[in-house]
């Protein structure tokens, strides 16, 4: 762009010059100036990272080998021979216990060997281990056994006649008036019966031996005062009566479930056994509805 402007200025100056002057043909200078070619290549900075190869120092420290042999201390066991004591005692006329001869055991004291080994001093390259020889001192055992002294005094036998005082025992055993044996019988559960009414508690009453229902200890229920009501007639007929029977003090009545009153309650009519029933039954139970029979009956 600058070269073109210079050429235009030179042409303009030549045109303005006076034409009547000498004929000087001045050709315009040809300035062929090529623009400089600046080829600047980017610098190639190839810097390799420094390779620092530092080997770790090899520190080889050999451990000193200190071989210390353990001291061999042999202590022979003491041989203490003690003859058994000969105690001869004449057999006495009375039976006496055999004499007790106490022989004290021999006291053999063996002191433990004192083996003192100093710790080895190991110096590097080469190790010098100095171990002093062990000094084992074993004193001979001193066994002192005194002869046993057996003293047997003549036995004194005193036998007094035994005094046996045996008083006749006073046995006062009154059997209880009445015992109730409870036994649970599971009913067959149906849709109508509830879970709480599936088990029925049956109370069995037992008479005192030798008593009758009239005396007050009958087969009445817990709620009844004296028992022996009209419902006990069937029970008295079923239980066997012993003529002129007296109460035995040593035997108490046992509670066993008698199957006879249960069988009698099924065969008898409904209003009679209600007197002997326990008071725990639900009296407000609604009667079941009887379905009408099909047919003319």
Swiss-Prot record:
Residues 27-58 have a biased composition (Basic and acidic residues). Residues 26-84, 141-218, 243-297 are annotated as: Disordered. Sequence repeats lie at residues 26-32, 33-39, 40-46, 47-53, 54-60, 61-67, 68-74, 75-81, 82-88, 89-95, 96-102, 103-109, 110-116, 117-123, 124-130, 131-137, 138-144, 145-151, 152-158, 159-165, 166-172, 173-179. Keywords: Repeat, Secreted, Signal. Residues 1-21 form the signal peptide. Transmembrane segments: none annotated. The gene is Sgs4. Salivary gland. One of its GO terms (molecular function) is bioadhesive activity. Residues 181-208, 282-291 have a biased composition (Basic residues). Changing residue 159 to A: In strain: Berkeley. It is found in: Secreted. One of its GO terms (cellular component) is extracellular region. The keyword rRNA processing does not apply. It comes from Drosophila melanogaster (Fruit fly). Changing residue 247 to S: In strain: Berkeley and Oregon-R(2/10). Changing residue 249 to S: In strain: Berkeley, Oregon-R and Oregon-R(2/10). This is Salivary glue protein Sgs-4. Residues 59-84, 141-174 have a biased composition (Low complexity). Residues 26-179 are annotated as: 22 X 7 AA approximate tandem repeats of T-[ETK]-[PT]-P-[RKT]-C-[ERK].
